[in-house]
């Protein structure tokens, strides 16, 4: 079983954690932006059939 040789420093751990958090933030922002464009009808990547009532 693979075991790390030395302890990871606190700063390196914090940097990696922040990178991981930032990825989630950008993914959420993209999803929100896509949902917003779908709701306003400005989406160019999805074709939503509009129903007239």
Curated annotation (Swiss-Prot):
GO terms for molecular function: structural constituent of ribosome. It comes from the Eukaryota. Belongs to the bacterial ribosomal protein bL32 family. This is Large ribosomal subunit protein bL32c. Keywords: Chloroplast, Plastid, Ribonucleoprotein, Ribosomal protein. The lineage of its organism: Eukaryota, Viridiplantae, Streptophyta, Embryophyta, Tracheophyta. SUPFAM superfamilies: Zn-binding ribosomal proteins. GO terms for cellular component: chloroplast; large ribosomal subunit. Signal peptide: none annotated. InterPro entries: Ribosomal_bL32 (IPR002677), Ribosomal_bL32_plant/cyanobact (IPR044958), Ribosomal_zn-bd (IPR011332). PANTHER family: 50S RIBOSOMAL PROTEIN L32, CHLOROPLASTIC, LARGE RIBOSOMAL SUBUNIT PROTEIN BL32C. It is found in: Plastid, Chloroplast. It holds the Pfam family Ribosomal_L32p. One of its GO terms (biological process) is translation. HAMAP family: Ribosomal_bL32 (MF_00340).
């Amino acid at each position: 079983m693979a075991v790390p040789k030395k302890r990871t420093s606190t700063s390196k751990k914090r940097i990696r954690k922040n990178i991981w958090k930032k990825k989630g933030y950008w993914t959420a922002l993209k999803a929100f932006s896509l949902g917003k464009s779908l709701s306003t009808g400005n989406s160019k990547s999805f074709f939503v059939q509009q129903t007239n009532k």
